[in-house]
């Protein structure tokens, strides 16, 4: 099992929660998740959740303007509020987006088979970047980023093509990038709910977790 650490510069700024999953059966389109997301979209338009101000504060504390570099959770909520549908990617990613937009916390979801060695949540160094998912290079200098033995591969705004989840994914790592003022009990509940939903729609099971108490 890979290790997980938070670099000193982010302690007191981000309180991540991590779960490792195995045995996932990911499909490109699942009618069950499709129906669930449609229901979620309708509910969010009727009763939109308050944007989590502490998530924006988390970005500001590392020098990022959250109105220009939006947390993934806020980007999803804005999309739904405009009347657009949540993206349909595959059954595991769709559940991840559902949790992110409902709980208004940024998530990262990664194919664990393509994560090499221990993972560290740290600030990106000057010149560091990675090919994004369906986009050009994602530059992470000065940004919160996950890095393994090969370098950066994800952050609370945009993840990498190298570790993206596909229909071939069987093992996954899900990360909740919660602000440091998130109550540990609340964060544990969010992770439990996320794992339960992912298990229900893909058949995966949790094999390990990391929580910053």
Which residues fall in each region the model found?
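Charge-biased, low-complexity intrinsically disordered regions
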Residues: 1-213
